[in-house]
Design a protein with these regions (language model features):
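Preference for intrinsically disordered or flexible, low-complexity segments
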Residues: 1-283
Length: 283
């Protein structure tokens, strides 16, 4: 791909070897085109080693003339590959290195990890019933990579989360969650029929680990870990407690649990502060 100057998709270069990396750096430093520069930044980010990080850091401090025609700095390009760096060039990991998917089971199963459970509480803004949109059992050996020895619950108003900037929770490892204050909407578009259907889904977690990019190129596969299938641009929210970038945890495509729904719910986590943030993207 590099020899033929194929720079899309950037995932082609994920963890590429030093020889490929050096060729990308050479091309990046020589280009005068913002379009080629943008693609090469993404490819180099996917390589993701120490030398690649150093080049991206240097380009943020001393940008090329074509940078003025791009929307974001090189550290944001690094986010496409699931990492970034701070002002001191300290590496920040934004994704997990394992991936599991949800698949259709024979029956509804609320033991362990599952999607969508009604909470029996109403949204203070629109009156829609609140849901635990994801319950994740970190004690399951499949999720040992999360480093969370307990049950994590992500809760939201399914109506408001699709029409607002997002909803955050504070969680405890006994499965409880506190929905933090959020800006909602007055109109409720969810009927009881929709909510019941959502809470009756038969999705269960896969027994086998999936490839890291398993969910990145499918808009009908719900995943935990790995890389997301961003509908718009990749987006890593800041933790409302500590202000640091949150890690991507999971994605749920609405049409897998709700007929004719559009868009995707992305779930991110700050393990240190025990904060979950959920937000919606759609075309």
């Amino acid at each position: 791909a590099c020899k033929r100057e194929i720079y899309y998709p950037s995932e082609l270069y994920y963890k590429a070897d030093g020889e490929i990396r050096d060729k990308l750096i050479e091309k990046l430093m020589a280009t005068t085109s913002e379009n080629e520069g943008s693609r090469l930044l993404g490819c180099l980010a996917m390589v993701g080693d120490e030398k690649a990080q150093g080049v991206l850091y240097e380009l943020k401090k001393n940008p090329r003339p074509w940078r003025k025609k791009l929307y974001v700095d090189s550290d944001v390009y690094a986010e496409e590959a699931g990492w970034t760096f701070d002002s001191k060039n300290e590496y920040i990991k934004l994704t997990y290195d394992k991936c599991f998917s949800f698949e259709l089971g024979k029956t509804r199963n609320e033991n362990g990890t599952f999607i969508a459970r009604k909470r029996g509480e109403k949204c203070p803004h629109c009156g829609c019933e609140l849901v635990d949109i994801l319950v994740l059992d970190g004690r399951d050996e499949r999720f040992a990579f999360l480093g969370l020895d307990g049950i994590i619950t992500a809760s939201c108003c399914p109506n408001c989360v699709t029409l607002s900037e997002g909803i955050s929770n504070r969680f405890t490892l006994d499965g409880k969650s506190e929905i933090l204050e959020y800006d909602g909407t007055d109109e409720n578009y969810y009927s009881d029929e929709y909510l019941n259907a959502m809470a009756e889904n038969r999705l269960v977690i896969s027994e086998k680990e999936r490839p890291l990019f398993y969910g990145a190129f499918n808009n009908d596969v719900n995943t935990i870990g790995g890389f997301a299938n961003w509908v718009q641009d990749w987006e890593y929210r800041e933790c409302p407690e500590c202000g640091r970038k949150m890690k991507y945890l999971a994605q749920i495509h609405w049409d897998t649990i709700e007929d004719c729904a559009e868009g995707t719910l992305f779930i991110e986590i700050c393990p240190d502060c025990k904060i979950i943030t959920m937000f919606h993207q759609q075309t």
